[in-house]
């Protein structure tokens, strides 16, 4: 049958209704494009707004072909008068298109009413129906903007998309046209009239290519579908063979498609599947099948398989840098945990800077001055530098206490509404913790890890004490000191629970045992000489916070009985792995990288991920922020303090015993090792002198600030990001600062801060901050901390001071809050962030708090 898509220059809905009513008008019908086959009827169609099964046009009226002489109008590219349409209307066929719809909107008994009268009385309903159902263009502009502005693109796209009922979008069809021919004809001007428009569409030589293009497009569509199904299959094969977190899975799928459909590859594929005039229509697009999926395997999946395999991962991606030297003058804590008395000093946060100042004053002329604050204080506690006074070596630390001649630890103890800081050289750990009594009640024989853990008894307390001597053994935190060697890896894990998770004893211990297997295998790759069947790893779990109400809904009694953990939000775990005697890790960055490596390795273990995926929301479990100098971490056996009333204790870190196979016979020794304070401190004291240091542990596929998937994305797009220094210089030049050649690196950032960054940040703070906060920024000066952080200091009466809290108006309102500007590069612009650290518990104890940010205008580089 002959089908034509038509348009009008007046509202098509009204024109169609007049034709159905057989009411002649002066309006013309313009046949835009025709699919011609010999038939008795001509079906006049319009494009629908919605399409089912890729049918994009529907008939609005039918004419008798012979009486209309439709070929005459097509041959001469002439519009058809609506009067001629009415005279040639096939009334029966046209009535069948509308009769059911009309009868549903008129009273019963209207079946015998003449069709044109029925249309006339339902005129408004039909106009609304036509308007809602069809696209009703009245000018060439719509067709040109939708299907293409060149003659070839317009006609080939329109013919295939409207008539062939294929599952291809307009954009896809346009791509097929470009692959079919590079000769797309002349531009069609958008200001042409409808008569000029059909003169192009009905007389174009591109009509001769309708059939061959349609056959090619169908073959191209089949090839594309096969290609993408194969590509999907390759992506899924790898995705199902490894256990990825939800976020990583999404990123993997994104990067896989981006890699396979990278611009140059897609151009190559399009050229490969372009129309070949030397081949028959049915043999088009058959060359080099599955090129995209096969290229994905070589460019990404083979690399991913290496990265997601435990053995090849360590061999190809993990780089460890060591240094062996028997003459290392590296000192650990000299800290006696079995002393008859505690040798410990207790100070508050205000006294830290005062004590640093005291050491600077007494050591003036002998020692380099230390920066005031917690970091400077930690440096004093770790420093082994000494001078001779009266023939005796004296360290700067001895100005704190004459017995502190060696490096010592520093702890934070949480009291009611405040924190105290303790440092010293001796304590009675076992006696004060009551461990001597605990060891007496251990079972005689090892039965299982579960039974050993359940029979291990610790004396509990519920209320916070006002005595520091007692609280020292209840709420103690170790403060990480990067100036000291690390002798134990301490991992802090938070496992966010699914709402329906039920943690049974068998499931929890299976999880811990599998974690131990993953970690000990990795540990053996780092330290090949250890015996992994005898090497200890110590686990602690935060006690459930609501034991009195184990499972409050949708569980049966047996499930309540077997529930081991009744936490609702997350499981908190602490893992301690002793570093072999004589070896230490230096700095915080290797520990952060090690945590990322452990997190990645856990995802590679099939059995472990099955358990984790059933009860938790997968993600990065290890907290890497604990390895920054000055950050503190709660020790094993210690409690949390209820933040609401600051009187109650909860969430004690209790030991979970996962005994190595070769230690099960002498399991008491393993328990004793887990109770040893020196095995659960970052910088615990070990017997042997340090002769080997590890100063770098690095995942070569993941630079410090990027994940593996981020690195792959960056490689894919080859985005070269400007350095902070380059952008600072450019901003200064743009703002009229020409004399920058003599500026050092330090001076450059300081000049940029004073001249550009701070004025904009100050303006924003004045506009958006409360007056109490904004007034603190009226007179400030700047100190450079590192290559991207500037510290702010208040300048008052010629003296420098820190700020009072920017977030809360604390009791006492002390000026001990550290405030910083951080600079981040985002493509060709700089992001400036104002943040602070407040020592109070309400402000999360020295954690980073971001207050505001300013984004500078992008530069043309």
Swiss-Prot record:
Q: What is its main location?
A: host cell
InterPro entries this protein is in?
HSV_PRIM
Q: Where is this site: Essential for primase activity?
A: 492, 494
Q: Which GO terms describe its cellular component?
A: host cell nucleus
Protein's cellular compartments: Host nucleus
Q: From the UniProt record, give one GO term of the biological process aspect.
A: DNA replication
Chain positions of all zinc fingers (CHC2-type):
805-843
Q: Tell me the disulfide pairings in this chain.
A: none
Record keywords, A-Z:
DNA replication, Host nucleus, Metal-binding, Transferase, Zinc, Zinc-finger
Enzyme Commission number(s) of this protein? 2.7.7.-
Which Pfam families did the record assign?
A: Herpes_UL52 (PF03121)
How it assembles, according to the record, is: Associates with the helicase and the primase-associated factor to form the helicase-primase factor.
Q: Which family does it belong to?
A: Belongs to the herpesviridae DNA primase family.
Protein name, entry field: DNA primase
The organism named in the record is Human herpesvirus 7 (strain JI)
Could you read off the lineage of the organism from its UniProt record?
Viruses, Duplodnaviria, Heunggongvirae, Peploviricota, Herviviricetes
Q: Which gene encodes it?
A: U43
């Amino acid at each position: 049958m002959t089908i034509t898509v038509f348009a009008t220059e007046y509202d098509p809905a009204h024109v169609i209704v007049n034709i159905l009513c057989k009411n002649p008008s002066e309006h013309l019908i313009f046949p835009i494009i025709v699919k011609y086959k010999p038939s008795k009827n001509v079906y006049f169609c319009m494009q629908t707004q919605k399409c089912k099964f890729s049918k994009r046009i529907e008939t609005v009226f039918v004419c008798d072909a012979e009486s209309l002489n439709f070929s005459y109008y097509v041959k001469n590219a002439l519009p058809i008068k609506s009067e001629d349409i009415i005279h040639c209307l096939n009334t029966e066929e046209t009535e069948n298109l509308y009769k059911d719809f009309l009868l549903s909107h008129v009273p019963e008994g209207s079946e015998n009413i003449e069709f044109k009268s029925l249309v006339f009385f339902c005129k408004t309903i039909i106009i609304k129906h036509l308007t809602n159902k069809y696209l009703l263009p009245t000018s060439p502009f719509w067709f040109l903007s939708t299907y293409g502005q060149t003659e070839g693109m317009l006609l080939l796209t329109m013919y295939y998309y409207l008539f062939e009922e294929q599952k291809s979008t307009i954009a896809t069809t346009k791509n097929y046209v470009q692959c079919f021919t590079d000769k797309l004809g002349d531009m069609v001007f958008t200001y042409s009239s409808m008569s000029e428009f059909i003169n192009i569409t009905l007389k174009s030589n591109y009509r001769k290519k309708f059939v061959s293009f349609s056959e090619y497009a169908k073959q191209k569509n089949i090839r594309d579908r096969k290609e993408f199904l194969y590509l999907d299959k390759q992506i899924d094969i790898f995705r199902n063979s490894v256990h990825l977190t939800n976020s990583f899975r999404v990123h993997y799928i994104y990067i896989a498609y981006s890699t396979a459909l990278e611009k140059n590859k897609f151009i190559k594929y399009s050229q490969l599947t372009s129309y070949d005039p030397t081949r028959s229509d049915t043999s088009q697009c058959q060359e080099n099948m599955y090129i995209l999926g096969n290229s994905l395997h070589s460019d990404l999946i083979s690399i991913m398989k290496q990265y997601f395999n435990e053995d090849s991962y360590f061999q190809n991606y993990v780089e460890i840098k060591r240094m062996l030297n028997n003459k290392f003058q590296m000192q650990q804590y000299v800290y006696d945990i079995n002393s008859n008395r505690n040798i410990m000093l207790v100070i508050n946060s205000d006294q830290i800077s005062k004590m640093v100042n005291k050491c600077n004053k007494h050591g003036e002329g002998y020692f380099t001055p230390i920066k005031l604050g917690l970091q400077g204080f930690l440096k004093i506690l770790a420093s082994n530098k000494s001078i001779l006074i009266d023939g005796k070596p004296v360290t700067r630390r001895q100005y704190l206490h004459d017995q502190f001649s060696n490096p010592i630890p520093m702890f934070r103890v949480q009291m009611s509404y405040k924190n105290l800081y303790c440092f010293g050289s001796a304590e009675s750990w076992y006696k004060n913790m009551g461990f001597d009594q605990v060891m007496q009640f251990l079972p005689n024989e090892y039965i299982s890890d579960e039974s050993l853990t359940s029979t291990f008894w610790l004396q509990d307390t519920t209320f916070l004490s006002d005595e520091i001597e007692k609280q020292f053994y209840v709420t103690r935190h170790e403060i990480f000191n990067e100036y000291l060697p690390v002798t134990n890896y301490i991992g802090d894990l938070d496992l966010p629970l699914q709402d329906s998770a039920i943690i049974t004893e068998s499931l929890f211990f299976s999880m811990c045992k599998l974690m131990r297997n993953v970690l000990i295998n990795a540990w053996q790759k780092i330290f090949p000489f250890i015996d992994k069947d005898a090497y200890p790893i110590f686990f602690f779990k935060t006690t459930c916070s609501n034991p009195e109400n184990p499972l409050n809904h949708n569980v049966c009694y047996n499930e309540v009985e077997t529930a081991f953990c009744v936490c609702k939000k997350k499981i908190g775990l602490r893992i301690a792995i002793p570093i072999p005697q004589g070896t230490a890790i230096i700095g915080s960055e290797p520990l952060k990288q090690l945590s990322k490596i452990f997190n990645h390795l856990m995802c590679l273990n099939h059995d472990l991920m099955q358990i984790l995926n059933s009860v938790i929301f997968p993600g990065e479990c290890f907290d890497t922020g604990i390895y920054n100098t000055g950050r503190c971490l709660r020790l094993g056996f210690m409690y949390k303090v209820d933040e609401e009333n600051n009187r109650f204790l909860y969430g004690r870190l209790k030991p979970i015993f996962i005994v190595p196979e070769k230690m099960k016979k002498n399991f008491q020794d393993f328990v004793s090792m887990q109770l040893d304070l020196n095995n659960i401190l970052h910088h615990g004291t070990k017997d042997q002198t340090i002769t080997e240091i590890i100063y770098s542990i690095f995942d070569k596929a993941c630079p410090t600030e990027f994940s593996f998937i981020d690195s792959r994305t960056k490689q894919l797009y080859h985005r070269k990001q400007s350095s902070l220094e380059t952008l600072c210089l450019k901003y200064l030049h743009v703002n009229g600062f020409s004399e920058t050649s003599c500026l050092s690196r330090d001076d450059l950032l300081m000049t940029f801060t004073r001249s550009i960054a701070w004025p904009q940040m100050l303006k924003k703070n004045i506009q958006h901050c409360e007056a109490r906060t904004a007034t603190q920024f009226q007179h400030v000066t700047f100190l450079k901390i590192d290559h991207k952080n500037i510290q702010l200091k208040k300048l008052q009466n010629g003296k420098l001071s820190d700020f009072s809290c920017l977030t809360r108006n604390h009791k006492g309102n002390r000026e001990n809050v550290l405030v910083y500007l951080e600079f981040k590069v985002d493509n060709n612009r700089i992001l400036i962030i104002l943040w602070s650290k407040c020592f109070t518990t309400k402000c999360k104890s020295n954690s980073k708090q971001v207050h505001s940010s300013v984004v500078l205008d992008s530069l043309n580089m």
